[in-house]
């Protein structure tokens, strides 16, 4: 008799996706991040749902409702700490997942990659509107600064900014709609993640060598389910260590003060996972130019398949490209550091150099390295 999981219409989909899925035999721990991201999303939706039961999206009560959750709700402090630090874990996994895709040439699965970039943008939007909800000083001023960037769009910019605000500044209407967006977006992310998987399963997973692995596949279960379980346990361990021992380490002290439109914090900065893009935005001394650079810093991922010049897919056997990749990684860490510093010398010039290097590496140096490696691999006799 054929197993129910192979015949039942619903179980059949799960079976083809997570049980009998043929997977390359050599995929490393870098391929764990997909399942870790799925887990992060589930944690965020669950903790977020329980937080939403006690939160009020009104400028007068939002801040005190968050304090109420932490003081009076059973394990409310834990829910809040898991949700806030879960976002940090989510972005850590996202950045590592994207980095893996760049290193091993996974972007050549164009549909999967493009959906992935859309997912990244959607998660960033969700995190931004979510950061506004506690209605602390940094929440309010972060929302003011970032939504103000819309006003740089010629002709319709100011109208668009006021339309998003629901008034002439960030206020009650803005907070209410941001809560609505923050509630709906994770479900859109879930749907997009399913589409992401759908396109991935059309081609099958890439692998570290970048060579077609069809001749050597193994079933996903039990081999990769057990491997993913180890990754999930480590993720849980790090998240719990963060949420229980230093829950405010990655937050901003200014957010412990209620929002005050009459008092601007000395350094307005977003959460750590946006700092690299914020540094690129600030490094251009022109508002519109900065916004375009900010958009380009993420949108550049969409053209990576067009910039691939190497004959080999993966960087595993391409030392020049590897070197440039790790320089790019160091550059992004530098940008993250600069984004959290005040706008003064020497941080301004370091940020500008790091921003130029970021685009130079992706648009010029890495494609040239691919061509050079092709030339070096050609027989010379």
Swiss-Prot record:
Keywords, alphabetical: Electron transport, Heme, Iron, Membrane, Metal-binding, Mitochondrion, Mitochondrion inner membrane, Respiratory chain, Transmembrane, Transmembrane helix, Transport, Ubiquinone
Stored Pfam families: Cytochrom_B_C (PF00032), Cytochrome_B (PF00033)
MF terms in GO: metal ion binding; ubiquinol-cytochrome-c reductase activity
Predominant localisation class: mitochondrion
Keyword flag Transmembrane helix: yes
Top-level lineage group: Eukaryota
Record GO cellular component, one term: mitochondrial inner membrane
Chain positions recorded as heme b b562 binding sites: 83, 182
Residues annotated for a ubiquinone binding in this entry: 201
SUPFAM superfamilies cross-referenced by the UniProt entry: a domain/subunit of cytochrome bc1 complex (Ubiquinol-cytochrome c reductase), Transmembrane di-heme cytochromes
GO terms (BP aspect): mitochondrial electron transport, ubiquinol to cytochrome c
Cofactor note: Binds 2 heme b groups non-covalently.
Cellular location(s): Mitochondrion inner membrane
Residues annotated for heme b b566 binding in this entry: 97, 196
Record function comment: Component of the ubiquinol-cytochrome c reductase complex (complex III or cytochrome b-c1 complex) that is part of the mitochondrial respiratory chain. The b-c1 complex mediates electron transfer from ubiquinol to cytochrome c. Contributes to the generation of a proton gradient across the mitochondrial membrane that is then used for ATP synthesis.
Family statement drawn from the similarity comment of this UniProt entry: Belongs to the cytochrome b family.
Oligomer and partners: The cytochrome bc1 complex contains 11 subunits: 3 respiratory subunits (MT-CYB, CYC1 and UQCRFS1), 2 core proteins (UQCRC1 and UQCRC2) and 6 low-molecular weight proteins (UQCRH/QCR6, UQCRB/QCR7, UQCRQ/QCR8, UQCR10/QCR9, UQCR11/QCR10 and a cleavage product of UQCRFS1). This cytochrome bc1 complex then forms a dimer.
Protein name as catalogued: Cytochrome b
Organism name: Myoictis wallacei (Wallace's three-striped dasyure)
Lineage of the organism: Eukaryota, Metazoa, Chordata, Craniata, Vertebrata
Gene: MT-CYB
